[in-house]
Amino acid sequence: AMSQIPDSAASARQFGAVGDGRTDDTGALQKALDSGQRTIHVPAGVHVIRRTLLIGSDTTLSLDKGAVVRLGDGAAAAAGGDCFLIRNRDVENGSENITVDGGVWDGNCAKNPRGEEYAKDSYGGVGMSFVQVRKLTVRNVTMRNNESFAIRVGEVDRFLIENVLLDHTVIRPNQDGIHVGGFSENGVIRNISAKGAGVPNDDMVALNADDDVTRHFNRGMKLGPIRNILVEDISAEDAYTFVRLLSNTAPIRDITIRKIRGGCRMYCLNLNRWRFPKGRGNIANVLVEDVKVAKNPGNGLPLVPVTLSVRNMRIRNFVRTDHDDKAKTLLIDDSIDVELSVDIRRAEKE
């Protein structure tokens, strides 16, 4: 793997990273990220960190196939509210041109439980956090045992998140895969897959223009528009929900969702109003196509609830593959403003 490192790259090993699963490599990895080198390579091995890695503008962090970044036992309690595996350095003025490519990002949630949800400096359990970033790429990563969201982004423009495996062996509440907050636009989220029963244990992809940003895992996010996003190639055997669109008054516009495969316990596509008043929602120009999903047994919730206001939404080539009649495929609140064209069919019984 060493031969793949471009000449301009620095290896974290040069800065003292050990990767033996015991040594605290935070300082060495941070020193590498602070070195001014545009590309930092992290070799194979288990790199234990005890506080957030900060990545600045114009930096690529490239991890070997066998590289693991793991939050050390008890590190979150010590680090408190601003604890992630990695985040962009400047969330006040913003960052640009950041790439994280490769590696296993292990939140070690069994040894790093979340803090109290509304306490000011409590750990929220998020894996990676990118807020106010222009030109962001996260690719080829395995997200493991994050206490809440695997990857969250807010106020991002021109972003690509691709080839992400959600590989949780410890199931926790609020384990969203890719969680997108307000003021995010021009994004591609693709080839996101999940391994095993109960994974992920919340929305695989959430586009939440409105939310409760006082909760610890949302701290630092804003309420605001989300627009021009492509979500494609999303697969799981036993997702909680595949894709959520959540809006109260903030607009969600120009969204394409395609190629969803597998099974879900709750919803395939969730447009319910959550805690917001009846009749809310500001969603328009949504295309959903090429869906082949099963409702996994266990509850009677509809695969696609629509209780938010939505205009110009099209669902086409949606095939439901299970034969359970307890759960409806589509449930629309007739008392609100919904403009939806639908092409949904049940697969033939074998």
Where are these regions (language model features)?
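Extracellular/periplasmic carbohydrate-active domains that bind, remodel
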Residues: A1-E350
